[in-house]
């Protein structure tokens, strides 16, 4: 596989979306430098990609967070406290 390529490729309604899946509470969601570079390059070339993380500090069903990677190599929290259905709806409307 290519270093840094996300876990999920989703093609829906003429949209091409990449999603990296994480389940941790570490800084930077535990993304490697290769993953960060992949997301930045993809974004700079007009692509859409997201990091979908399970917030392990939450015990509810609404424990998902959505992040994006932006310059200068920053991880930006876009949405929080989502269940899986709402997370996919948010990703589709971006």
Enumerate the predicted regions with their spans.
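Helix N-cap and loop-to-helix transition residues
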Residues: 32, 68-71, 83
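Conserved catalytic cores of phosphodiester-cleaving nucleases, focusing on short active-site segments
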Residues: 8-10, 15-25
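Active-site-adjacent loop/helix micro-motif of nuclease/hydrolase catalytic cores
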Residues: 25-36
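Charged phosphate-binding loop/patch that engages nucleotide di/tri-phosphates or the phosphate backbone
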Residues: 78-94
């Amino acid at each position: 596989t290519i270093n840094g390529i996300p876990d999920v490729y989703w093609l829906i309604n003429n949209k091409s979306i990449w999603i990296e899946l994480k389940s941790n509470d570490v800084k930077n969601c535990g993304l490697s430098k290769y993953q960060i570079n992949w997301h930045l390059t993809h974004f700079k070339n007009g692509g859409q990609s997201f990091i979908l993380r399970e917030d392990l500090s939450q015990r509810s069903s609404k424990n998902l967070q959505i992040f994006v990677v932006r310059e200068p190599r920053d991880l930006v929290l876009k949405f929080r406290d989502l269940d899986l259905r709402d997370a996919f709806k948010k990703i589709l409307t971006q």
